[in-house]
Amino acid sequence: MMWPQPPTFSLFLLLLLSQAPSSRPQSSGTKKLRLVGPTDRPEEGRLEVLHQGQWGTVCDDDFALQEATVACRQLGFESALTWAHSAKYGQGEGPIWLDNVRCLGTEKTLDQCGSNGWGVSDCRHSEDVGVVCHPRRQHGYHSEKVSNALGPQGRRLEEVRLKPILASAKRHSPVTEGAVEVRYDGHWRQVCDQGWTMNNSRVVCGMLGFPSQTSVNSHYYRKVWNLKMKDPKSRLNSLTKKNSFWIHRVDCLGTEPHLAKCQVQVAPGRGKLRPACPGGMHAVVSCVAGPHFRRQKPKPTRKESHAEELKVRLRSGAQVGEGRVEVLMNRQWGTVCDHRWNLISASVVCRQLGFGSAREALFGAQLGQGLGPIHLSEVRCRGYERTLGDCLALEGSQNGCQHANDAAVRCNIPDMGFQNKVRLAGGRNSEEGVVEVQVEVNGVPRWGTVCSDHWGLTEAMVTCRQLGLGFANFALKDTWYWQGTPEAKEVVMSGVRCSGTEMALQQCQRHGPVHCSHGPGRFSAGVACMNSAPDLVMNAQLVQETAYLEDRPLSMLYCAHEENCLSKSADHMDWPYGYRRLLRFSSQIYNLGRADFRPKAGRHSWIWHQCHRHYHSIEVFTHYDLLTLNGSKVAEGHKASFCLEDTNCPSGVQRRYACANFGEQGVAVGCWDTYRHDIDCQWVDITDVGPGDYIFQVVVNPTNDVAESDFSNNMIRCRCKYDGQRVWLHNCHTGDSYRANAELSLEQEQRLRNNLI
């Protein structure tokens, strides 16, 4: 509800005139629906429809399950469970748009059903209908976005920022303290502090990418306000006279992901007798930045132990603060089902990780499918929980969730100004070109190029992330065919080495004085970015189940020897007499990403191998290694990508890649490539290895030649016991699937890495 206002005063809202786009394709005549009610469940509530820019209700006359089914499907749910009459979810306001709705049950939208017509009704709001939908989302219903959070009259609040007041706050990024301003009609407007609460500050800070808020010195800011108001030439005095206090009052619960969800009272228009902010001043907010965005690292303190705290991480996101949600339970990482997944629960995840509130809650494995167990389903948060583990939830195995239903988030992050310090020039489109960066040279900002020495896919990934362009497709060292910016011809950065977790190239290691062996020009670094990427994952269980030993005669290993699939000691044997002891196994490599996995080299450069009569499209596709418990290699092998193809695909997905007849090579999204145990080079040569306990390791795409959304799951490891005659593999797992101490006990070393993505 809005606060009551005198009818003689005209009000105007700081709201966008355009409606937020729907998350599903709809025709221009399709009406938006929403569910409103006292519960925090997104799948149930009072049914409301948007018509002529105003939300209204639906009467329960003639309403039944088939009408509820049409409404639920339009809202993105699979079906309807039931419906409720007599305003069970509370009485609505405004018009009753529809009455005597009659559907066959096959309509795609509610406005395709029969009714009395728009606004033709003899009902009262005590007859408002409600629906309860099945919590499972339809395939293809992608996300709940902040832009879909409509305010009054179907409109939404615009952008928010903090205008720094203190001189010290103006010199640093991100800005964490200042006056709240909102953007309308191309101008920034102020917000009155009357009735301003910490709940309001929490919502504003969340929108700006900060997990929490803190109190401000209101007495100091009031003193500054009074001094500036006495100065007739001050900007503040001028703005006040122009009645720039657009929002007069805000009332938030603190759990809202956006100000559009708060109650807003809007200031009177210009020329009205009532002042916009009588006796008040602009609202001032102070936010607390997450650990990734603080200007100075906090001093080490004794942290309170939370033994039961549920650990959360994000995977496969293109940007900082986005990814598939994974939680650590029973010492193993697993995913979260998207049933009942919404912005409030997603915001708890974001804040737990040090980001702001969620700007998007994604459904249907939109950021790729995870591995292992599905730990949680039907997560229901109220918004103030410290961790996701404090929310109500079911076990993921209880309601038939699959990894196709993995939930993901996109969080609000602070504006660090990084995106303005890199650009691409000369490319065919905005997603490719020569990399130009801005650095300080003798205290003066200067644009220039990056030396391509040591330039690789990791550095390109950081660049694309900094630009907000997703993943890197190619890292280019030779860019003579792209014309850069004339004023940025000089090399200003060289020796760049990134770990992959940086938010900007400027955070990577690099030379002090620039040293580039090639000089500027054609050897400047370049990138080509893409919105989505593949994600290769090996079936660890199949490796464990199919491992065995074979003593293979040298007479049958000529081709394998030619392709370097045997240990070095094989070079000194008396061919064709003797044998090699081989640890053989089968492997399945799945593409769980959002784009096809294709060889980096074009087919014109594939190499023909006469012995096996096949083409190599990637020099090394996998590494097979046997390690001691301290990580030293005792045996190794490699497998060239002689045949990348879709061996099998899920039902309904067509195979796209096949090696026969010099066909295209690759692995399509959702498909997998199988290498049977009985083909050449599908082994590790352990002839020279003595009995003992070892670690068996397989790494896919080991040199990161082809871009992926997540490289951390490219490795599997198994415990291996070899007694000289037999071999046992057990505890096979993806490299990042267990928590650190479980890995330590298994391998005596910590291999887990969890970056910002």
Curated annotation (Swiss-Prot):
Keyword flag Glycoprotein: yes
PTM field: The lysine tyrosylquinone cross-link (LTQ) is generated by condensation of the epsilon-amino group of a lysine with a topaquinone produced by oxidation of tyrosine.
Region annotation (Lysyl-oxidase like) ranges: 534-737
Lineage summary: Eukaryota, Metazoa, Chordata, Craniata, Vertebrata
Location in chain, cross-link Lysine tyrosylquinone (Lys-Tyr): K639-Y675
Subcellular location field: Secreted, Extracellular space
EC number: 1.4.3.13
Gene: Loxl4
GO terms under cellular component: extracellular region; membrane; receptor complex
Residue positions with a glycan: N199, N630
Cofactor note: Contains 1 lysine tyrosylquinone.
Domain SRCR residue range list: 33-134, 160-288, 312-412, 422-530
Keyword field contains Iron-sulfur: no
Protein name: Lysyl oxidase homolog 4
Residues recorded as bearing 2',4',5'-topaquinone in the entry: Y675
Catalytic reaction list: L-lysyl-[protein] + O2 + H2O = (S)-2-amino-6-oxohexanoyl-[protein] + H2O2 + NH4(+)
